[in-house]
UniProtKB/Swiss-Prot annotation:
The lineage of its organism: Bacteria, Bacillati, Cyanobacteriota, Cyanophyceae, Oscillatoriophycideae. GO terms for cellular component: cytoplasm. PANTHER family: N-ACETYL-GAMMA-GLUTAMYL-PHOSPHATE REDUCTASE, CHLOROPLASTIC-RELATED, N-ACETYL-GAMMA-GLUTAMYL-PHOSPHATE REDUCTASE, CHLOROPLASTIC-RELATED-RELATED. HAMAP family: ArgC_type1. InterPro entries: AGPR_AS, AGPR_type-1, NAD(P)-bd_dom_sf, NAGSA_dehydrogenase, Semialdehyde_DH_NAD-bd. This is N-acetyl-gamma-glutamyl-phosphate reductase. It is found in: Cytoplasm. It catalyses: N-acetyl-L-glutamate 5-semialdehyde + phosphate + NADP(+) = N-acetyl-L-glutamyl 5-phosphate + NADPH + H(+). It comes from the Bacteria. SUPFAM superfamilies: Glyceraldehyde-3-phosphate dehydrogenase-like, C-terminal domain (SSF55347), NAD(P)-binding Rossmann-fold domains (SSF51735). Its main location: cytoplasm. The active site is at C155. The gene is argC.
Length: 352
């Protein structure tokens, strides 16, 4: 593709935090042009009325969702909609020749019975769902390149799976001992008002939620099972912390070989992610901080071994809105189009 040729893309559900992150990234992407911003609840409004800080670079209105119109204008469509809506739109867009990247949970599962159990929506699109590819490029790069439909991962699963993948793929841990303790900023709850995300409620406080029943649990387990080659069950507990963005997931598991030391695992992780430009393995004794990943598409991994308990401890830090959502979707787009994987994606944080 030449330097001046751009593909037309659309975003359905552009008014949420994931949507505005997509807009920001795609505005600066050299190979795309945003030709459609959609959302029925905001239809008719200038996009800059919703996000005034973009008044100088986004002149488009939010348009009503019209599949025929979208397909006639867009080669690629991002779906940033609530769970349970994308599965009604994606089949129609695919039929009309669009590539589709879904940021909801609708196409993350191979088994729709699992989806229906956890998301309380019956599905009849199994034939479409089996064509989707889980959009974690570090694990499924080749499949993403060949797919027309991507189910982009959740933010917690992204951080957790990147921490666990080398251990499961190489059989280094006892899978059923895996525990994921994860903490996220309030932007993960979305832009709509929620009591627990109010400043007066969240500031100066830390608490768990969705204990033993968070919807990201089956998503994590399905990919873990794929990596391990057998069914895997994990213990996952998320927490809300009083900051805007970022996830820190700390993963614990028992090593099969208690003789493994930290240096061994760092070597193993570096080899596993040697072709993954956005995963950074930290040196001995350095542990990640969410600030380092803020505004970037990076995942920082820190590794430790506790010889007293024979457990490995892996800490994973990402920006929940970039690597955990919009940035990862753009990373998948780059692969689908045959472009450089890092194109248009930030790798330097704002610091301090």
């Amino acid at each position: 593709m030449g330097d001046t040729e751009q593909i037309p893309v659309g975003i359905i559900g552009a008014s949420g935090y994931g949507g505005v992150q997509l807009v920001r990234l795609l505005i600066e992407h050299p190979n795309v042009e945003i030709v459609y911003l959609g959302g029925d609840s905001s239809a008719g409004k200038p996009y800059s009325d919703i996000y005034p800080h973009l008044f100088h670079c986004v002149n488009q209105p939010v348009e009503a969702i019209d599949i025929d119109e979208i397909a006639s204008r867009c080669q690629v469509v991002f779906l940033g909609l609530p769970n349970g809506i994308a599965c009604d739109l994606a089949p129609k867009l695919l039929e009309k020749g669009c590539k589709v990247l879904d940021l909801s949970a609708d196409y993350r599962f191979r088994n729709l019975e699992t989806y229906s159990t956890w998301y309380k929506k019956d599905r009849t699109d199994q034939a479409i769902a089996v064509r989707s590819v889980y959009g974690l490029p570090e694990l499924y790069q080749q499949q993403i390149k060949e797919s027309q439909l991507i189910g982009c991962p959740g933010c917690y699963p992204t951080a957790s799976l990147l921490a666990l993948a080398p251990l499961l793929k190489q059989g280094l841990i006892v899978p059923e001992t895996a525990i994921i303790d994860a903490k996220s900023g309030t932007s993960g709850a979305g832009r709509q008002a929620k009591i627990n995300a109010l400043l007066a409620e969240a500031d100066g406080s830390l608490g768990a939620y969705g204990v033993a029943k968070h919807r990201h649990t089956p998503e994590i387990e399905e990919v873990c099972s794929d990596l391990a080659g057998h069914e895997v069950t994990v213990q996952f507990t998320p927490h809300l912390i009083p900051m805007i963005r970022g996830i820190l997931a700390t993963v614990y598991a028992t090593l099969r070989d208690p003789g493994l030391v930290r240096e061994d695992l760092i070597t193993i992780y570096n080899a596993f992610y040697r072709s993954s430009p956005f995963v950074k393995i930290l040196p001995n004794g350095i542990y990640p901080q969410t600030k380092w990943a803020c505004g970037t598409n990076l995942c920082y991994l820190g590794i430790e071994v506790d010889p007293r308990t024979d457990r490995v401890i892996v800490m994973s830090a990402i920006d929940n809105l970039i690597k955990g959502q919009a940035g990862q979707a753009v990373q998948c787009l780059n692969l689908m189009m045959g472009w450089e994987e890092t194109l248009g994606l930030p790798q330097l944080c704002f610091y301090p």
